Structures are given as structure tokens and as C-alpha cells.
Amino acid sequence: MTARLVSILEQLRSIIKRFEVETGAIEKAFVKNDPLAALKLGQARASAMIALGESKIEVSEYAPNYVKKIFAGKGHATKEEIKRMASLQFPKVCFSQTDEADALAIAVCHVHTLKLNANLNRAIKKAM
């Protein structure tokens, strides 16, 4: 497990540097009845947050249902529905795993939310 967490950390450091990442987003932890899965997920999330934090990159967290609602139009979309929507929105991208589509959904949700917040802030300033 340690090697896997180090690998996550190192890969993210490389991506952050290569693509000059300015902002980050992760999904909030959601675990039903599996404490071991919750622990592993928490460790992977920590690796991601450390990589982003080292570079002073702000991290936003989104609830799974919010991501699904923004990306697929319904908050209880299945992994297959997310993958199908990702394929429709990005037809040139081949998603071999549903996790890849999930990651893209989080990124799209983040961009959408940033734009929404910026528009809202402009409207508030204009109204004052």
C-alpha cells in the first residue's frame, strides 16, 4: 500500500509540474459499509491533497451526488451512466475504466462550479 500511495503522490507531482496546474478538485469521501475501503480512499485522497498542497494549489471538494447532477443531469447516476455521458461529451476519448470517466466528471464539475461562482460574484458586485 505504501508504494501505491507514493506512486500516486509522485505521479500527481509530475502532472502538476508538466501541466502547470492552478486548481484541483477531489470527490468527497463516500463509503457505505466498508471501513477498509474508507481507510484506503482516505489515504489516496491524502496523497492527492499533499501533492496539490505542496504546490500551494487550492483544492475543492465535491459531493458525489453534486458531481453526478452537474455532469449527468441526475444526482444518482450510475458509474455506467457517467461513463456514457463522458463518451458523449468527449467522443474522441476512450474510457477503458469507469474511474477515468469519474475523474473527468469531477474536473468538469469543478470548471462549471468555478464559472458559476465567478458569475455569481460579478452579479453580486454589480447589484451592490
Model regions: which residues?
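Phosphate- and other anionic-substrate recognition elements at nucleic-acid/protein interfaces
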Residues: M1-M128
